[in-house]
Amino acid sequence: MSKNTEKSFDDLRKMPSEIEGRIPTIRVIAMPADSNPAGDVFGGWILSQMDLAGAAHAYKFAKNRVVTVGIEAMNFHKPVFIGDEVSFFTHMERVGKTSITIKIDSWAFRRKGGAYEKVTEGLYTYVTIDAERNPVSIPENK
């Protein structure tokens, strides 16, 4: 393999500056069962993966059970294809008395082409609850 004609694996996996150095909350590979007849991955599958990532982040912060109460914003920038490795990056946007809002960005590493592309972004809100499913306060100084 010539260095002039072939890209190295490290070159192909170079992350864009927006995600370089960040660790995804979850990373999954889109499979055929996740797609529609046209071969694109269902938007609902992407939404559910984003929800899992956001809930994991909220739970780690609150150290308590959380439930999804809303999606305030959701944008689909590009399709996800079968075989893409999708990374979900989370960032805490707001913390209220009982709620946590998490910004979630999804990036696909393309199986074909070997490049990263931002595919979705959204704001998900979670509420902390007790065993009886009642909202509970998030302790300060988390």
Which residues does each predicted region cover?
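HotDog/MaoC-like acyl-thioester-processing domains
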Residues: 3-7, 13-16, 20-26, 81-82, ...
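Short, ordered coil/turn segments that flank beta-strands lining enzyme active or ligand-binding pockets
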Residues: 33, 37, 131-132
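Short, well-ordered turn and helix-capping elements at secondary-structure junctions
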Residues: 32-34, 71-78, 108-110
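Phosphate-binding glycine-rich loops and adjacent basic patches that engage nucleotide phosphates
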Residues: 6-20, 46-52, 65-67
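Hydrophobic beta-strand-centered segment that forms part of the acyl-chain substrate-binding groove
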Residues: 41, 52-89, 93-95, 99-101, ...
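A conserved, well-ordered hydrophobic junction motif at loop->secondary-structure transitions
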Residues: 35-48
